[in-house]
Amino acid sequence: GQTVVNNISLNIERNSVYGLLGPNGAGKSTTLKMITGILKPTSGNIEFDGHTWKRSDLNHIGALIEMPPLYENLTAYENLKVRTTVLGLTDKRIDEVLQIVRLTETGKKRAGQFSLGMKQRLGIAVALLNNPKLLILDEPTNGLDPIGIEELRELIRSFPAKGITV
């Protein structure tokens, strides 16, 4: 097989926003997929929170890789309700994350009718449900207009104050 990621070492400060920059094919998405357990490294190890990464660490990692996995026929609230039921979380948490991503006013509007920016914010809300210590976002501003990009950047900048490393 082809080597995609080689000799990478990252040390990311807690409660900060950290970005991976590089040309297409440099291994940025592959690295993020390894941290989220989607891909398994063929060698080396990943340290998380002072220990070698293990599957249970996924309880502390939220991720939005590429397009958000949304039920287009459900409202923002209903999309989150499906997940809180599986995770055993309260409805109060739904209200909290909708407030964080500023989607409290969507009412009965279905996710399929959302703008791309609203869909990205709902995807981030899904990733925030479990109160992650680490939030991984892979190209979250793709396809957004300049105003949507600025709103999303502002949202991302607010996370370290909430104890979330991005």
Go through the PLM ranges and name each one.
Residues 2-166:
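ABC transporter nucleotide-binding domains
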